[in-house]
């Protein structure tokens, strides 16, 4: 399995740079070679005082993840692989990402999904 480095959140003031497996691309997903990423306010608050939104005991309702989680959810890069069901973007496209894992977000209704 191919590896990548990731900033992994384990708890308040406990972020570790680790080698993790590069995830396999599922049919409705793309793989992005990240060129730039930042630390947003949510990352900072999770680092200083978390857990706030990061699930520690049970899996997140949409992502299925729990601690440890990889930080850096706002980024820019280039698509390097597309899943079999992806039709709107292609390898080589440059993209920016603010992933919000919520059903209502798909239609722009950020305020209707549970935290």
Q: Predicted regions span which residues?
A:
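Short Gly/aromatic-enriched secondary-structure transition segments
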Residues: 45-53
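Glycine-rich beta-strand-centered segment in the early N-terminal region that forms part
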Residues: 23-37, 52-110
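Generic structural detector for well-ordered beta-strands
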Residues: 19-21
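Short N-terminal binding/cap micro-motifs at the start of the first secondary-structure element
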Residues: 13-17, 41-42
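Short structural boundary motif marking the start of a folded domain
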Residues: 2-7
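Disulfide-bonded cysteines in secreted/extracellular proteins and peptides
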Residues: 40, 113-115
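Residue-level signal for short segments within beta-strands and strand-turn junctions
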Residues: 8-10, 48
């Amino acid at each position: 399995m191919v590896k990548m480095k990731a900033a992994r959140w384990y708890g308040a003031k406990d972020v570790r740079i680790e080698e993790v497996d590069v995830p396999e691309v599922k049919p409705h997903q793309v793989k992005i070679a990240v060129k730039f990423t930042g630390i947003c306010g949510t990352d900072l608050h999770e680092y200083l005082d978390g857990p706030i939104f990061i699930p520690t005991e049970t899996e997140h309702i949409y992502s299925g993840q729990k601690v440890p989680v990889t930080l850096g959810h706002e980024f820019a890069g280039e698509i390097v692989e597309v899943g079999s069901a992806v039709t709107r973007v292609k390898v080589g496209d440059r993209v920016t990402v603010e992933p919000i894992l919520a059903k209502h977000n798909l239609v722009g209704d950020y305020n209707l999904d549970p935290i």
